[in-house]
A protein has these predicted regions:
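Binuclear metal-dependent hydrolase catalytic cores
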Residues: 2-226
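Active-site-proximal loop/helix segments of hydrolase catalytic cores
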Residues: 210-213, 223-262
């Protein structure tokens, strides 16, 4: 019993010592942690190809273990997001991606849970990469309104960030977002919304009635294809363009759960 008491006392003393020096310990560990983080390039680790990941798979209702809709796409050495639900950008960081490397965001539609993380996405990309041009947000008609709203809401913050961090880290010209809008395609039609370095991104219409516009995106790179549906009911147009592709990322929901929530 006496031996256990002595051990317990020693543990308490050691713990108190560590706690009292916690600031110095953190400062000593910080350079190594920063170096490890900066030296890791997730895109290079993945290699040249078409890579898809989920950075969020929840819905509009809060859930402790779910983040808002968000898909990571890596191709041609570039990093993209498809939809920007809450916490999606933070999950990308946990996945090892450099948030400053985000090339663009593709929006499938304008439900709140698919767009509510956009402000944070644009800010972390800007501050994390020292960009001097805004983040491109691709989407169907109406994306201009979304982007204008977020830019207005974050306008003062961009001034504060620039005043605090300076032009080298946060140039004012790189703050916010730029809308890249396309008409919703007719059924049977693909509209090219991005084409660079061998990567082609095409937009197609899906059925998310009564929400319109609502689109999916088809990614093609080096002979590989991935189709991300966004929110949709059963869609013959989506089925048509999904034939023969390598990967389909499709929405799923429980009608029983939805009915119970009404």
């Amino acid at each position: 019993m006496k031996k256990r008491t002595v051990i317990a006392a020693l543990l308490i003393i050691v713990s108190l010592g560590i706690y009292s020096q916690r600031g110095d310990i953190v400062l000593r560990m910080l350079p190594a942690a920063m170096e490890a983080n900066l030296s890791t390039n997730k895109i290079e680790q993945l290699g040249d190809g078409l890579h898809i990941g989920l950075c969020g798979a929840g819905g509009p209702m809060p859930a402790a273990t779910r983040s808002g809709p968000c898909v990571v796409v890596v191709a041609a050495g570039k990093l993209f997001m498809l939809d920007a639900g809450s916490n999606g950008i933070r999950n990308m960081g946990r996945m090892g991606f450099d948030m400053g490397q985000i090339e663009g965001v593709f929006l499938t539609h304008f439900h709140s849970d698919h767009i509510d993380g956009l402000g944070e996405v644009a800010t972390l990309r800007w501050a994390g990469g020292g960009h001097n041009t805004p983040l491109n947000i691709y989407g169907p008609e109406g994306v201009d309104d979304i982007v204008d709203g977020f830019n207005s809401a974050y306008q003062r913050d961009s001034i504060y960030r620039n005043d605090h961090h300076g032009d080298a880290a946060t140039p004012r010209s790189g703050a916010g977002m730029n809308a890249v809008s396309f008409p919703q395609p007719e059924n049977g039609i693909l509209t090219t919304v991005y084409e660079q370095d061998g990567l082609t991104v095409e937009m197609l219409t899906v059925n998310h009635f009564p929400i319109t516009p609502a689109v999916a995106y088809l990614f093609t790179y080096k002979g590989r294809t991935a189709l991300v549906s966004g929110d949709t009911n059963k869609s013959t147009n989506l089925q048509h363009f999904a034939e023969g592709i390598d990967l389909l990322v499709h929405e799923a929901l429980s009608k029983t759960m939805i009915s119970a929530m009404r």
